[in-house]
Amino acid sequence: MSKVLTSLPVGQRVGIAFSGGLDTSVAVAWMRENGAVPCTYTADIGQYDESDIASIPGRAEAYGAEISRLVDCREALVEEGLAALSCGAFHIRSGGRTYFNTTPLGRAVTATLLVRAMLADDVLIWGDGSTFKGNDIERFYRYGLLANPRLRIYKPWLDTAFVGELGGRKEMSEWLQERDLPYRDSAEKAYSTDANIWGATHEAKKLEHLDTGIEIVDPIMGVPFWDDSVEIATEDVTLSFVQGRPVAINGKEFDSPVDLVHEANAVGGRHGLGMSDQIENRIIEAKSRGIYEAPGMALLFIAYERLVNAIHNEDTIASYHNEGRRLGRLMYEGRWFDPQSLMLRESLQRWVGSAVTGEVTLRLRRGEDYSILDTTGPAFSYHPDKLSMERTEDAAFGPVDRIGQLTMRNLDIADSRAKLENYAQLGLVGQAQAELVGSLQSGGAEAIASVGTHEESDAGALDRAAMESGTD
């Protein structure tokens, strides 16, 4: 049976994720006028585009809300963001720039905590402002039902009665004015913005057109690094990590992780760090475009991955990137608390993040222009003496050892040569690649794998004996 209601549940409590903007203000007043009992829940997620969030519940009461609550989600959101950081749970990247999934992170925390708050008030119907074309409608649906399996969904924007009466911003404004209800109609912009403590998303309207660049965006978490008139001074910053968690910035520890993230945002924001322009695939596989800000996450991520590369081996790093990307997509789809995500999170945090302890010093300039000045830690796999070109005592291996290692490679090189000869016979190579690979005559593989003919040495006798009587 569908959990989605398409008409107003008259006489019942309906919880609304309330931002205080025009859309949700009208929704609350309209539901009250038409016989429902609206209850509003506002998430404090540290959003940088809201300067007076404490006043929002009071505004909701003016529109007829029976219950109006402010739910502090900041600590939970920071913790989930730090988990995503340690897992590298970011799948959207373009030209070396990363989108740090700040909106999906916010939705996971907001939906879960708001529905739990509604459940405590015995509010079992929930609505929000997401549209049917976007990602959020599915994210909120999934997280809402995980938090309250009895939850039903009512969205005024899916109700033909509401849309027919109040289909646009002009109609909404006039409707409130006719009833002498106050409202806060934000200035019309060339794009829409959604923000939380980890980042800001700018999308829609003019940004839907790919001939419009990042320069039309007015950053809310930092400076427009592309504007030459904005002075940006060079700054050195040291990030400290313990077991995959950032613990200090420039040697300063903070009373809470929330305070640390605020400081990271301030440092990164001063340089315009962490802004990116991305084309992505929505959950429904339609492509969309967004401009993103995440100065603090970008700053921490640079240092974190520097330490990951200094500490872990190649296969571990490959797994970190592969599984992190998969986890990022799952989060994007609203599956951050699904079993497959929990499995990946547990593995990445336990076996990758827990080993990441150290400090990285960066020199920040403008935008993504930075230098790494120093990298230190107690358990690096990076040991310069192992590969030093200078003469070293007690070296891990010597010239003769490398000759033996190269000889062992003859087996797979011979196999590759045999495949190339076969491909040449099939006409798959040696045509477009003729200048590079030349002609491939048969017999090359055998020549590579052959040991040649020479008098048997002691080593040869041992090898023959092992093959005759030993095991592999």
Swiss-Prot record:
HAMAP family per UniProt: Arg_succ_synth_type2
Species, as recorded: Saccharopolyspora erythraea (strain ATCC 11635 / DSM 40517 / JCM 4748 / NBRC 13426 / NCIMB 8594 / NRRL 2338)
Binding site for L-citrulline: 99, 135, 139, 192, 201, 203, 280
Residue segments, region Disordered: 453-472
A Pfam family the protein falls into: Arginosuc_synth
Location of the protein in the cell: Cytoplasm
InterPro entries per the UniProt record, alphabetical: Arg_succ_synth_type2_subfam (IPR023437), Arginosuc_syn_C (IPR048268), Arginosuc_syn_N (IPR048267), Arginosuc_synth (IPR001518), Arginosuc_synth_CS (IPR018223), Arginosuc_synth_type_1_subfam (IPR023434), AS_cat/multimer_dom_body (IPR024074), AS_multimer_C_tail (IPR024073)
UniProt lineage: Bacteria, Bacillati, Actinomycetota, Actinomycetes, Pseudonocardiales
Residues that hold L-aspartate according to the record: 131, 135-136
A GO BP entry: urea cycle
Assembly with partners or alone: Homotetramer.
EC number in record: 6.3.4.5
Pathway membership, UniProt: Amino-acid biosynthesis; L-arginine biosynthesis; L-arginine from L-ornithine and carbamoyl phosphate: step 2/3
Gene3D superfamilies recorded: 1.10.287.400, Argininosuccinate synthetase, chain A, domain 2, HUPs
Residues involved in ATP binding: 17-25, 43, 129, 131, 136, 194
Annotated gene: argG
Family per record: Belongs to the argininosuccinate synthase family. Type 2 subfamily.
One GO CC annotation: cytoplasm
Keywords: Amino-acid biosynthesis, Arginine biosynthesis, ATP-binding, Cytoplasm, Ligase, Nucleotide-binding
Enzyme class, spelled out: ligase
Reaction(s) catalysed by this chain's protein: L-citrulline + L-aspartate + ATP = 2-(N(omega)-L-arginino)succinate + AMP + diphosphate + H(+)
Record-linked NCBIfam families: argG, PRK05370.1
Name under which the protein is recorded: Argininosuccinate synthase
Coiled coil: none
GO molecular function annotation: argininosuccinate synthase activity; ATP binding; protein homodimerization activity
UniProt main location, coarse: cytoplasm
